[in-house]
């Protein structure tokens, strides 16, 4: 059965609130490193330079700095 527009809107708002709460929590991180998806970084993340985080998996790489985040 298809979702109603009201339940779809509520779901989208919940996703946005979750995303921005994680972004806000990460921006308040006292390390000075921009971690937009702070609680999603694995424990093997490496600090590769001044304020730059890189994490590689077999399929993609997440590179983040204070200016931008790229998923390659």
Swiss-Prot record:
The highest taxon in the source lineage is: Viruses
Protein name per Swiss-Prot or TrEMBL:
Putative ORF1 protein
Q: Which organism is it from?
A: Leishmania RNA virus 1 - 1 (isolate Leishmania guyanensis) (LRV-1-1)
Traced from the root, the source organism's taxonomic lineage reads: Viruses, Riboviria, Orthornavirae, Duplornaviricota, Chrymotiviricetes
């Amino acid at each position: 059965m298809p979702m109603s527009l009201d339940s779809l809107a509520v779901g989208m708002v919940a996703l946005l609130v979750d995303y921005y709460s994680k972004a806000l929590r990460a921006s308040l991180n006292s390390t000075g490193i921009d971690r937009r998806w702070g609680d999603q970084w694995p424990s093997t993340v490496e600090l590769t330079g001044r304020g730059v985080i890189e994490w590689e998996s077999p399929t993609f790489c997440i590179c983040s700095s204070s200016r931008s985040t790229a998923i390659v």
